């Protein structure tokens, strides 16, 4: 018990000394401020204001630089976003130009070249997540993916596809071009 009491007494003494030291430092700082003339006090505060203004200006400049860099990165991303797709299309264009330059007159070779070109284009579309919208005959008209170009009397159920005039395309899940279709209407 005696030992515990000594430790507690020592801790209390240390705490009291810490409080006393803090009070002395505070009083000393206050005393120093009191010893300053108003002009010195104003000059000190003006220097502090100038330092804070400088810090603020630097922070604003850094923020503006970050904003500008972010805008530049977004602009570059927009500008070069289709780079891979464009590279794929260049190959397709090369194949088409070679087919046009071919003067051999061999229809089978031309057909094979066009088939290879189509495969290259389909591969480019797959890589770019471009998919066909190719409704089948009898499919219900989907106004999100189909555009009814006309309606014709048919034995088919009304508002179903009876003919596809042109395929549509999706980019991922967004419609690039709706499929152009003719839909059935009830016979009069």
UniProtKB/Swiss-Prot annotation:
Location of this chain's protein in the cell: Cytoplasm
PROSITE patterns in the record: GRPE
A cellular component term, taken from the record's GO annotations: cytosol
Record InterPro entries: GrpE (IPR000740), GrpE_coiled_coil (IPR013805), GrpE_head (IPR009012)
Gene Ontology molecular function, alphabetical: adenyl-nucleotide exchange factor activity; protein homodimerization activity; protein-folding chaperone binding; unfolded protein binding
SUPFAM superfamilies the record matches: Coiled-coil domain of nucleotide exchange factor GrpE (SSF58014), Head domain of nucleotide exchange factor GrpE (SSF51064)
Keyword vocabulary terms for this entry: Chaperone, Cytoplasm, Stress response
Primary localization class, coarse: cytoplasm
GO process annotations (BP): protein folding
Source organism, top-level taxon: Bacteria
Pfam hit, one: GrpE
Protein purpose: Participates actively in the response to hyperosmotic and heat shock by preventing the aggregation of stress-denatured proteins, in association with DnaK and GrpE. It is the nucleotide exchange factor for DnaK and may function as a thermosensor. Unfolded proteins bind initially to DnaJ; upon interaction with the DnaJ-bound protein, DnaK hydrolyzes its bound ATP, resulting in the formation of a stable complex. GrpE releases ADP from DnaK; ATP binding to DnaK triggers the release of the substrate protein, thus completing the reaction cycle.
PANTHER family: GRPE PROTEIN, GRPE PROTEIN HOMOLOG, MITOCHONDRIAL
Family membership noted in the UniProt record: Belongs to the GrpE family.
Assembly and interaction partners: Homodimer.
Name this polypeptide is given: Protein GrpE
Name of the encoding gene: grpE
């Amino acid at each position: 018990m005696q030992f515990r009491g000594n430790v507690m007494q020592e801790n209390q003494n240390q705490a009291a000394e810490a409080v006393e030291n803090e009070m002395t430092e505070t009083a000393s700082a206050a005393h120093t401020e009191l010893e300053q003339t108003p002009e010195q006090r104003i000059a000190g505060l003006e220097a502090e204001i100038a330092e804070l203004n400088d810090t603020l200006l630097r922070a604003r400049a850094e923020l503006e630089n970050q904003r500008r860099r972010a805008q530049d990165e977004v602009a570059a991303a927009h500008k070069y976003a289709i780079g891979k797709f464009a590279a794929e299309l260049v190959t397709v264009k090369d194949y088409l130009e070679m087919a046009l330059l071919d003067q051999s007159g061999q229809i089978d070779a031309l057909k094979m070249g066009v088939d290879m070109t189509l495969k290259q284009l389909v591969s480019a579309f797959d890589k770019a997540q471009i998919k066909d919208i190719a409704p089948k005959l009898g499919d219900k008209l989907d106004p999100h993916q189909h555009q009814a170009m006309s309606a014709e009397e048919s034995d088919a159920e009304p508002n179903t596809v009876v003919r596809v005039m042109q395929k549509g395309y999706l980019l991922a899940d967004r419609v690039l071009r709706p499929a152009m279709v003719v839909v059935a209407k009830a016979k009069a």
